[in-house]
Amino acid sequence: MDLRTGEYITAHQATSGVYTFGITNPLYFTITRHNQNPFNNKYNTLTFQIRFNHNLRKELGIHKCFLNFHIWTTLQSPTGHFLRVFKYQVCKYLNNLGVISLNNVVRAVDYVLFHVFERTIDVTENHEIKFNFY
């Protein structure tokens, strides 16, 4: 849903994309929170954010695009190592597709978390997306 207008994102907006070779460093990854063994459970929770680069947003007609993911996992790896491997695998998936779009980024995250990484329990996603009016 567009955060500004409240309208749903159309299929055309979600699937329109840009070739990966046309833009350098299209995505910015950051870990916003990491809880190790909350309430003495056997899992960790990670919250990370994927932001679209200015050039990618300009090509797609997006004013703002933040994809926030909250992950429950039993992996015990350090957060820096997790982020580095996650970023590499997502970029590798997108390079193999050749096109970056909203749907492809969400598919890449789903593929990496559930097929590349083992022991992912659950993932929730929320987003802040604003499309350009003009």
From Swiss-Prot:
Keyword annotations of the record: Host-virus interaction
GO BP annotation list: viral process
Ranges in coiled-coil conformation: none
Family annotation (InterPro entries): Gemini_AL3
Subunit (UniProt): Homooligomer. Interacts with the replication-associated protein (REP). Interacts with host proliferating cell nuclear antigen (PCNA). Interacts with host retinoblastoma-related protein 1 (RBR1), and may thereby deregulate the host cell cycle. Oligomerization and interaction with PCNA are necessary for optimal replication enhancement.
Family designation: Belongs to the geminiviridae replication enhancer protein family.
Main function: Increases viral DNA accumulation. Enhances infectivity and symptom expression.
Name the record gives this protein: Replication enhancer protein
Organism for this UniProt entry: Tomato yellow leaf curl Sardinia virus (TYLCSV)
Taxon lineage: Viruses, Monodnaviria, Shotokuvirae, Cressdnaviricota, Repensiviricetes
